[in-house]
Amino acid sequence: MTYSLGGLIQATDYNGFASTTAGGNVNIMWGTGTSDAGYGQSTTLATVSAGGTVTATQWASLVNRISSIASHQGTTITARTAPTAGTVIAVLSAVQTDLNSCYTNRGNAAGTGSQYTSWTGTSSKTTATGSGSTAWTITFTHTITWASANAARYFFNAGGRIKWECSKTSTGTLADTEWNDLANTLVGDIYITGGTGTQTINGGSYTGTTKSGGTGTPTTLATTTGWYDLLTTDTTIYKQFADTSPYTGQYIQINAKTAGTGTQLVLTTTWVDPGGSGAGSSDNISGGTATSGISFGTAPATVVTYFPPSTTYLTEASWGTPTVAATVA
């Protein structure tokens, strides 16, 4: 690249910044990109033909797009003013340095969108479960579906987060107390992000599978497993056991996988009681009232929602509106 103070701005210089420099260029982050790079914005920069003139308008678009990317991420870059038509285009310092910084921080997001809570189906088991000291399992399945594999990529690349949470407050059996403690106190909220490294999103740190709250120490917490690490077969990303005898065999577990050729995230949550709690105790639990949105009833419930990326500095919500379908068995 010939781009330097006192030199002429050539088409190859501009094209490198816009789309041809490996890794650190505008279009790989702003446009379709590949894998964990790309916000899916349609307003990418056109290249200039070899030997062509780079106009002030084109240069301004480049400067403004770098600013938008950095602002979306919260990346600090060099302050610069976009040129205007009719003025001499001066060489601006540290353009490639700033692009490299933005590429390194491509998974970060300074803000977040509003929580989506309009899941469909059933997320709570309102009838009682178990009989005496017999083993039982409640299975909650949540399927998040995007319109395309690219839409799913854009969601995670731009800072989208999947949120998992559970609750149970119903009473009436000996086992209810410990199950309520497990679901409401020991288990925290679980967030699933892209997972290719640590992302700073809306001021929080996320690594793929991130636990927020909850006093329990899980036997499994796949901290570095996120969307890009999942397979089409189940991976256990979280498992928390109860902590009070004789119920320490009870647990809540989350398995995650992709489906639909990269268009779906499937979370299968199991509440498991192995039975055999012994004399003076029981393994059956109460049902209760149903959950709606993120307003929990009293029944055993597992809810999956999401926070889409912020569009404050982007031009479009390229990830669309993913749906969340819930079942319980």
Which sequence ranges carry the predicted segments?
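Extracellular "spike/adhesin" assembly and maturation modules
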Residues: 1-129, 133, 137, 268-270, ...
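Solvent-exposed, flexible loop/coil segments flanking beta-strands in beta-rich domains
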Residues: 110-175
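Long, acidic (Asp/Glu-rich), low-complexity accessory segments flanking structured domains
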Residues: 172-186, 260, 280
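Extended, charged low-complexity segments
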Residues: 195-329
